[in-house]
Regions:
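Periplasmic polypeptide-binding modules associated with outer-membrane biogenesis and secretion
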Residues: 38-245, 274-282, 412, 432-433
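Repeated loop/turn-to-beta-strand initiation elements of outer-membrane beta-barrel proteins
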Residues: 210, 235-237, 264-270, 294-300, ...
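Transmembrane beta-strand segments that form the barrel wall of outer-membrane beta-barrel proteins
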Residues: 214, 235-245, 256-257, 267-278, ...
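Residues that define the transmembrane beta-barrel architecture of outer-membrane proteins
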Residues: 221-223, 250-254, 280-284, 320-324, ...
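Outer-membrane beta-barrel "beta-signal"
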Residues: 258, 453, 513-522, 542-554
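Outer-membrane beta-barrel proteins
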Residues: 260-264, 287-294, 329-336, 370-381, ...
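Outer-membrane beta-barrel translocator/channel fold
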Residues: 304-331, 335, 349-359, 527-545
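C-terminal outer-membrane beta-barrel translocator/porin domains of Gram-negative envelope proteins
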Residues: 352-484, 489-498
Length: 554
């Protein structure tokens, strides 16, 4: 039975036969976002550089975002209402955030009527909810025991202030943690936005695990903030073996990623990558990142180097690529289950190619990029999650070879994912990747390609390449056991090819099986074409396509 028929059988027999309608519903969520890892083509320099990019399929969210829940507002038994009392004035005590006039507006103005105790409690309830809606999630209004004099009732507002602010855990990191909390002061009113931001920034520092609690303080209305931090492993990495390369650079590849936490300063990180394919293709990268200040900003610098000797019809061609990158990022928003970051990136790539031992071309690609990344988690019931990136870049390519593609271009690109739980063990994942460029004939460093293990999986890497295009993917996941899952997938994409501005549309369908634990993960995928188009980059025209990836953490 071929893959296409097998998918039909599974969909018909599955309790999730709503797959196709859900695809349409999911498509309504798409907005623009950035492309990662779908640009490897025969244009050699760009293809090598793109090997450093995380594949778009692996676009992942950040660490768990901090979340604070307000305690419930007290409810009172109406049977305790008792007799009514005439009220014509309310006295508010301890309010510093909102004025008397603002609070009266919330409760509907100065009362002049009889109130039961329950009705007075409802007034306090409105005030408490107003504070919490404005982010003061520990605030509450209470009506203390009192004698009503001159028809005036007193309402005490406990706005919720910081008591003691301190760190626990490894004492060596205490001063560094407290530097991030300096803006939070004892006796200041607790507001969710600045607190979540501080906790979120600390939680995202590499090489550490954090735990935070708010507990009753020494005074009424105060809460102590405790941040516990413990170091994790300061050296770790992974080995990845996959067959997702191109036939010119080598379909099979091995890649090692190593991360070090050197602690030159608190929160810094070194990343190193080494990769070798089944052909004569080597590449490496080293990068260093560190915080800027104590508000979540980070700076990163990287250098990469690759060498290659092509096979097949490009057998006489060899060369090397040297890349430089500088990046600054800053979290614009860290809130309850949502985050938005801005990134500014400058990049330069120098590509030198040799043909039969003689210099063929030297090409320089300079790029200035601004991007916005975002993540949003919704209710735990639906387990909805959306995350992605949007980038705008200007590029300038120069070459010493006559007739080579060069010049300036503006590129808008995007990558966005949505995960939606549709049953207890089933999740529908949908994804859109697109790119729009101001001109055609971009090299593969900036181009757009549909085929590959992270694109339309029924076609080989480099299939259908151009400057403008989009890719849509839909995956229906079903958890099998604690560490394994299987899913059906549908891929569809369109690209305007540089040669003659021809538009190509490709589609594929298939099955994927995954297994993972802390040390090992395995991904097996089999995809068959839905479109009639044959491959233009692989003479074998293999259909279906089989992809495999093994990842070992150490």
């Amino acid at each position: 039975m071929n893959i296409k028929k097998l998918c039909q059988v599974i969909v018909l027999k599955s309790q999730f036969a709503v797959f196709l309608p859900l695809i349409f519903i999911s498509a309504l969520f798409w907005v623009f976002s950035s492309i990662y890892g779908l640009t490897e083509t025969i244009d050699t320099g760009g293809a090598l550089k793109n090997s450093f990019k995380p594949p778009a399929k692996n676009l992942t969210s950040k660490n768990t975002l901090p979340m604070f829940e307000a305690p419930p507002v007290e409810r009172f038994n109406p049977q305790e209402a008792g007799a009514k009392v005439f009220i014509r004035n309310i006295k508010f005590l301890n309010n510093t955030i909102f004025t008397r006039r603002e609070i009266l507006t919330v409760i509907g103005g100065v009362p002049s009527r009889s109130f039961s105790l329950t009705e007075l409690f409802k007034l306090a309830d409105k005030i408490s909810r107003h504070y919490r809606n404005q982010g003061y999630f520990l605030a509450r209004a209470i009506i203390p025991n009192q004698k009503i004099k001159n028809n005036t009732v007193s309402i005490v507002i406990l706005e919720g202030q910081y008591g003691k602010i301190y760190s626990e855990g490894d004492a060596a990191y205490g001063p560094q943690v407290m530097a991030y909390l300096n803006d939070l002061k004892t006796d200041a009113v607790i507001r969710s936005d600045p607190l979540i931001r501080k906790i979120g920034v600390i939680s995202q520092l590499p090489g550490f695990e954090t735990e935070y609690t708010l507990s009753p303080g020494a005074k009424i209305g105060q809460s102590d903030l405790r941040v516990k931090i413990e170091p994790t492993s300061h050296a770790f990495g992974s080995l990845n073996l996959a067959n997702d390369g191109s036939r010119f650079f080598g379909k099979n590849r091995g890649r090692v990623d190593i991360t070090l936490i050197p602690e030159v300063i608190f929160g810094d990180q070194i990343n190193m990558t080494l990769m070798k394919t089944s052909e004569t293709f080597y590449l490496g990268r080293i990068g260093y990142a560190r915080p800027i200040g104590h508000d979540g900003g980070r700076v990163k610098v990287e250098m990469s180097r690759s060498t290659y000797d092509l096979s097949g019809q490009f057998d006489p061609l060899e060369g090397h690529t040297t890349g430089y990158l500088a990046e600054v990022s800053y979290p614009l928003l860290i809130g309850n289950q949502k985050e938005t970051d801005a990134v500014l990136r400058v990049q330069r790539d120098e590509i030198v190619e040799m043909l039969a031992g003689a210099k063929f071309e030297k090409r320089v690609n300079e790029k200035f990029e601004f991007g916005i990344s975002f993540e949003q988690k919704q209710s735990l019931l639906t387990a909805s999650r959306r995350f992605g990136q949007i980038t705008v870049a200007t590029t300038n390519v120069s070459s010493d070879r006559a007739g080579a593609a060069q010049g300036r271009a503006v590129i808008l690109s995007g990558n966005i994912e949505q995960h939606q739980r549709i049953a207890r063990s089933s999740v529908l994942k949908s994804r859109l990747v697109f790119q729009a460029a101001s001109r055609q004939n971009l090299n593969s460093l900036e181009g757009f390609s549909l085929g590959g293990a992270h694109g339309i999986r029924a076609y080989p890497v480099g299939e259908a390449s151009g400057s403008n295009g989009f890719l849509g993917q839909f995956e229906l996941y079903e958890s099998l056991y604690a560490a394994s899952a299987a899913y059906l997938f549908l891929d569809y994409g369109q690209v305007t090819e540089n040669a003659g501005e021809k538009t190509r549309r490709l589609a594929g369908v298939g099955l994927d099986v995954q297994f993972s634990n802390k040390r090992l993960s395995l991904d097996l995928s089999l995809a068959q074409r839905l479109s009639m188009a044959a491959s233009s980059v692989d003479p074998s025209n293999r259909d279906p396509q089989f992809w495999t990836s093994v990842n070992i953490n150490f």
